[in-house]
């Protein structure tokens, strides 16, 4: 450990082009309650695209993206009791919170108003946070989770964001009961994990998509019980009032009213996708039948650990395409075109340093 911090190598965006290239920087000195982690794999989330292209207007360049991190502990501070060197661990969307607000007190650190996000955030010392497209992380132990040995580390990486984003509201709103009927809207990175968790909970799962071509994927590859095209008026009408709950994972603008019609009275819809345009929600659509609509943003540390433990017990991992670091820009371009089944994961430990050396010599 260097006196002034740990030398780190990452791949960073430097402007709104979003193009990533090698970037050397320094992680903070390991503190008493810190865990130092060698990054093995990091998933690519659509949020990373928003950040590196400054689509949310808050990019702090240069910025290293990545918040779906799986790695191995290489060092711990003197006060660390939860982890030891050699443990396989994960880091998700945030790496710190205030610990003093109402949300933190109730165990919902993910809703802390001053939560420190893993990439493109500002820590409590004023430094910009750099994410998991890097070879090393230094994180407080309370924001690190244990990854079960039964999970493949590459397939586990997207669980740190996409997995907990669907798992958390399913448990929170009782959409995890055997025999209940769950609708999963969208069959992408979030949706395919919603199907997997729903089936593991013993639920009847119907995939709802605007793309009829995804029927085979939903029923064959993922084992959903039924498929419903949102463009099929007759099919939608026949399925009215049949579902106990719906997880809406779609990030493109779409009408909610046809989806709400699928819910039984007192049914629950949870929105986890984030369309850029405001969603339209006429009051009558929820008044009739006493239906409820909620949102969800990732999950707490405890929820993330519970999700990983459940995934480990039931063999749930993301379906991933692993890419080398020198292919990350191409992967980001494909993600922008929705050309992935279902998540990209970067092989950080296996390819980063070779990719940086090749970039330096070119």
Swiss-Prot record:
Zn(2+) 2 binds at residues 98, 101, 104, 112. Keywords: Lignin biosynthesis, Metal-binding, NADP, Oxidoreductase, Zinc. Its EC number is 1.1.1.195. One of its GO terms (biological process) is lignin biosynthetic process. Zn(2+) 1 binds at residues 45, 67-68, 161. Involved in lignin biosynthesis. Catalyzes the final step specific for the production of lignin monomers. Catalyzes the NADPH-dependent reduction of coniferaldehyde, 5-hydroxyconiferaldehyde, sinapaldehyde, 4-coumaraldehyde and caffeyl aldehyde to their respective alcohols. InterPro entries: ADH-like_C (IPR013149), ADH-like_N (IPR013154), ADH_Zn_CS (IPR002328), CAD-like (IPR047109), GroES-like_sf (IPR011032), NAD(P)-bd_dom_sf (IPR036291), PKS_ER (IPR020843). This is Probable cinnamyl alcohol dehydrogenase 8D. The keyword DNA-binding does not apply. Homodimer. It comes from Oryza sativa subsp. japonica (Rice). Binds 2 Zn(2+) ions per subunit. One of its GO terms (molecular function) is cinnamyl-alcohol dehydrogenase activity. The gene is CAD8D. Its cofactor is Zn(2+). It catalyses: (E)-cinnamyl alcohol + NADP(+) = (E)-cinnamaldehyde + NADPH + H(+); (E)-coniferol + NADP(+) = (E)-coniferaldehyde + NADPH + H(+); (E)-sinapyl alcohol + NADP(+) = (E)-sinapaldehyde + NADPH + H(+); (E)-4-coumaroyl alcohol + NADP(+) = (E)-4-coumaraldehyde + NADPH + H(+). NADP(+) binds at residues 47, 165, 186-191, 209-214, 249, 273, 296-298. It is an enzyme of class 1 (oxidoreductase). Belongs to the zinc-containing alcohol dehydrogenase family. Pathway: Aromatic compound metabolism; phenylpropanoid biosynthesis.
């Amino acid at each position: 450990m260097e006196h002034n911090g740990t030398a780190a190598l990452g791949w960073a965006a430097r402007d709104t082009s979003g193009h990533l290239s090698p970037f050397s920087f320094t992680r903070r000195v390991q503190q008493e309650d810190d865990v130092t982690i060698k990054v093995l794999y990091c998933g690519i989330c659509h949020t990373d695209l928003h950040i590196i292209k400054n689509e949310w207007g808050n990019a702090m360049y240069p910025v290293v993206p990545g918040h779906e991190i799986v790695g191995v502990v290489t060092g711990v501070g003197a006060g660390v009791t939860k982890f030891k060197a050699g443990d396989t661990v994960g880091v998700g969307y945030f790496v710190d919170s205030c610990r003093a607000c109402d949300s933190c007190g109730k165990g919902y650190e993910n809703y802390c108003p001053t939560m420190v996000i893993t990439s493109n955030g500002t820590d409590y010392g004023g430094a910009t946070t750099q994410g998991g497209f890097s070879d090393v992380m230094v994180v407080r132990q309370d924001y690190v989770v244990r990854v079960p040995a039964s999970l493949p580390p590459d397939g586990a990486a997207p669980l740190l964001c996409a997995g907990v984003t669907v798992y958390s509201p399913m448990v929170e709103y009782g959409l995890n009961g055997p025999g209940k009927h769950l609708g999963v809207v969208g069959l992408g990175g979030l949706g395919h994990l919603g199907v997997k968790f729903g089936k593991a909970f013993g639920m009847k799962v119907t995939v709802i998509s605007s793309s009829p071509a995804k029927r085979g994927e939903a029923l064959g590859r993922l084992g959903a019980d039924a498929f419903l095209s949102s463009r099929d008026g007759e099919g939608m009408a026949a399925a009215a009032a049949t579902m106990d709950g719906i997880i809406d994972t779609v990030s493109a603008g779409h009408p909610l009213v046809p989806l709400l019609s699928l819910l039984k009275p007192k049914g629950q819809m949870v929105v986890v996708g984030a369309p850029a345009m405001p969603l339209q929600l006429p009051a009558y659509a929820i008044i009739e039948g006493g239906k409820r609509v909620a949102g969800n943003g990732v999950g707490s540390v405890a929820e993330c650990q519970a999700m990983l433990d459940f995934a480990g017990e039931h063999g749930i991992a993301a379906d991933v395409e692993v890419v080398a670091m020198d292919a990350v820009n191409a992967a980001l371009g494909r993600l922008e075109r929705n050309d992935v089944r279902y998540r990209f994961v970067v092989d950080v430990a296996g390819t980063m340093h070779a990719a940086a050396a090749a970039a330096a010599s070119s």
